[in-house]
């Protein structure tokens, strides 16, 4: 069963990557911006809870963490070769000249968001806040190097 799921995941990714490779650069950039918007949409309320701007709600926090963990793996698809130009973007050209490093940083985001979802599901506020800082660090590592100010 696990092998079947893994095969389906690989085939799904290959199909999505192939479809994105056939898209115009501006379509890929639109996709990228959309994924990042959804990630930010879910990150912001979690950040507000961690910073104490709003009361911590474990159920809401876990919902946002789960959504973020679902979106993070999709981010890399939005940085397809040739999508460095074609529309207004905050992505620095260094992404494509240092793609392995960029990909590594995005993989860190995927891993930290997955862990965030698992920790948040357990409902422990202190542990969720601690993991959120690691998640924020993964975001910051990529933004500092690869996102225009």
Predicted regions, residues:
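Positively charged n-region of N-terminal signal peptides that target proteins for export
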Residues: 1-5
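Bacterial N-terminal signal peptides
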Residues: 6-15
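Sec/Tat signal peptide C-region and signal peptidase I cleavage site
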Residues: 16-23
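Sequence context surrounding c-type heme c attachment/ligation sites in exported
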Residues: 26-58, 64-149
């Amino acid at each position: 069963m696990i092998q079947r799921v893994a095969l389906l995941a690989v085939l799904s990714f290959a199909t999505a990557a192939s479809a994105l490779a056939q898209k115009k650069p501006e379509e890929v950039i639109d996709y990228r911006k959309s994924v990042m918007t959804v990630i930010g949409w879910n990150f912001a309320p979690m950040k507000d809870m961690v910073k104490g701007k709003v009361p911590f709600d474990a159920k809401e926090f876990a919902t946002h963490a789960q959504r973020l963990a679902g979106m993070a793996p999709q981010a890399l698809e939005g940085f397809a070769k040739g999508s460095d130009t074609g529309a207004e973007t905050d992505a620095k050209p260094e992404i494509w000249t240092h793609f392995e490093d960029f990909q590594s940083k995005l993989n860190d985001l995927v891993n930290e968001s997955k862990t965030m979802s698992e920790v948040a599901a357990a409902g422990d506020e202190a542990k969720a806040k601690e993991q959120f800082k690691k998640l924020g660090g993964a975001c910051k590592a990529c933004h500092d190097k690869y996102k225009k100010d």
